[in-house]
């Protein structure tokens, strides 16, 4: 059984929830629109964490992320896009290692497009949203970016689960792939 853990910021834990719904065979309102029941009995969610703050990243994941460019009124970190990409990788790797999962998924978005990372210790996939938004200036783009981030995270995980990485890499939103081959 494939074990997955998520450390999520702008996707608010919904990626882990959707994977769990599919793995549990939930249908209807409880089910996953994107994954269906494809993962039933084949995947286990070790943890699905919503971690919007730097202090949360430090205490829960044991990482030392860069200081945020800005901080929201609620204390949420707000990095610019380039730093979000680096932090998403840190989050995915740390949640995988910390929980003993086979796969870690990290998502974060502050100012710009959202960053999505999937890491299994050998393969690191880095994707992004197309939607630009600013966490410090909330408007409808925040929600659009979140929904696209959830969908793309699930599409990325599904491609990984199905061993369809070559097809995934044809998507323009998958920015980087690192394969550490023996």
Curated annotation (Swiss-Prot):
InterPro entries linked to this entry: HcgF
Family: Belongs to the UPF0254 family.
NCBIfam families documented for this protein: PRK00962.1 (NF002122)
The name this protein goes by in its record: UPF0254 protein MK0012
Source species of the chain: Methanopyrus kandleri (strain AV19 / DSM 6324 / JCM 9639 / NBRC 100938)
């Amino acid at each position: 059984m494939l074990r997955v853990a998520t450390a999520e910021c702008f996707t608010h834990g919904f990626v882990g929830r959707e994977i769990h719904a599919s793995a549990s065979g939930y249908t209807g309102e409880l089910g996953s629109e994107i994954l269906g029941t494809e993962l039933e009995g084949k995947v286990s969610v070790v943890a699905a964490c919503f971690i919007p703050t730097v202090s949360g990243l430090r205490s829960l994941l044991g990482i030392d992320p860069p200081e945020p460019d800005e901080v929201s009124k609620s204390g949420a970190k707000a990095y610019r896009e380039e730093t979000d990409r680096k932090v998403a990788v840190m989050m995915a790797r740390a949640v995988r290692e910390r929980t003993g999962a086979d796969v870690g998924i990290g998502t974060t978005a502050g100012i710009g497009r959202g960053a999505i990372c999937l890491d299994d210790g050998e393969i690191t996939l880095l994707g992004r949203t197309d939607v630009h938004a600013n966490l410090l200036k909330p408007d409808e783009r925040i929600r659009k970016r979140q929904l696209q981030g959830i969908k793309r995270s699930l599409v990325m995980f599904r491609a990984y689960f199905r061993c369809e990485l070559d097809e995934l890499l044809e998507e323009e939103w998958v920015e980087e792939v690192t394969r550490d081959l023996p």
